[in-house]
C-alpha cells in the first residue's frame, strides 16, 4: 500500500506495512518527531488521508509510565508540544494533546486507533516505544515511518557494526538526499479533531501540570535548555553562525564549548535532522564536514544498530570478543568500587569524572568527548560488564535530556567494545577493549575550569533558597535544589 506514496515517502515506511481499512480518519501519532515541518511521518499521514478521502489529525500524548519519567523530561517534552500545537494550527492541521495524570488516565490512543483507517507513527527502535507500537498494531493498521535518519532506516537489511562499513553503505543514499529541499505536504481538508477533550498548552501552566503528574519530582528541569522547535532552531542557528567553522578544532575541548548542544532537540524531533544536514552541506568548511560525519555516520549507525539489535540494553548485545575479554579481566583486583549513590551524586572523588556527572545532574547534558571518559571509567569501577552497562544506562537515561536515544545506546555500548575493534596489547580491567583512563584525559584540558562551569546554576542566575522543614521530604527538596545549582 505504500505504493500510494511518492518515492521519497514510500522509502521511509517500514516494509510490509499492513493495508489501511475502512475507518473514520487517519491518525498521526507523534512521539519523537514533534515538529510541524520537514516531518516525513506527518506527510505520510496527510498523503494517505487524501488517498483514502478521510480527515487526518495529529495525536500527541505524554505518559507517566515510561521509565525515568521526571520533571526534567516532562517539562522539555511539554515545551516542545506547545510549539508543535501552535505550528500545526498555523498550518491548518488539527491536533489533540493528552497529558496522563490523575484526572485522566484513559487509553485514548487505543480508543482512537479502533476507529481509524490507519495509524501512522514516527519510529524509534528503542523501548518502551517498540512495546507501545505492538499494542497499537494489535487494534489498527500501523505504519511506522523513519523521520529521523537521512538514509532511510529500512535501507539496510543486514546489520553493520563498524563505522567505516556503515559509511560506505550509506554514502550513496546520503549523497542523493543531502541537499534536496523538503517540500511539506499540505492538508487536503479543513482542520479536523475527533470528540476529544484536548489540553490547550498555549494557556497551560506547565509547572503546575508537571507537578500534578505521578513522576520523579527529584530530577529538576534544566531552565537554560527550553524544549521546542523555537529553542532548537535558535540553538542550531547560533552554532551554525558562530561555532560550526571551528568545530573540527574545538570539539574535543569541553572548556571551549565547541559543540552544538542540539542532541536533545534531535532526540525529540523538535529540530529537523534534514535541515541540519542540509545546512552543513552548504557550509563547506572542515568543521561542517566533521560535524556532518558525526551527524550521519555515528548517529545513524546507532539507529541502525538499535533497529537490528532489539536487546541493545543487555550485555549480550556486545560482540563476543568484548564480552570474553571483559569477563577474563573481572579477576583483576578493583582498587575502587563506588556505590551507585556515589556515582549518581558525582561524589567519587575523581575531579574529572565528578564534573562529568555534575554536568548530567544539573544541566542534563554531557560533552561527547568527556562522555567517553565518563563511560569507560565504569569498567574498572564496577564488578563486571553487566553492572557497568546497567549503571551507565541508568545514569544517562535518568538525567540526560537526550537519554534513551539510539545515540545514547550507541555511545555507551561503544565504551564497552561495541561498534569498535579489539585493541592490543591488552590492559588491566579493559582487556582488549579500547582503554581510556580519566587521569590521562584530565591532562588534555583545564579540568578546574570545566568543574567551575559544571557547577554554574542551571537557572543562569544564582538563587538563595532556604528549605524549611525536616524529614525525608525536606531532605529530598534540598537535594533537588542543590542538583539544579
Which residue stretches match the model-derived regions?
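Glycine/tryptophan-enriched, flexible segments
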Residues: 21-22, 152-154, 159-317, 449-450
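Short, flexible loop/turn elements at secondary-structure junctions
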Residues: 30-34, 99, 123-125, 146-149, ...
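A short, basic/flexible loop-to-alpha-helix module at the beginning of a structural domain
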Residues: 15-19, 455-463
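Active-site-proximal binding-pocket segments
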Residues: 253-446
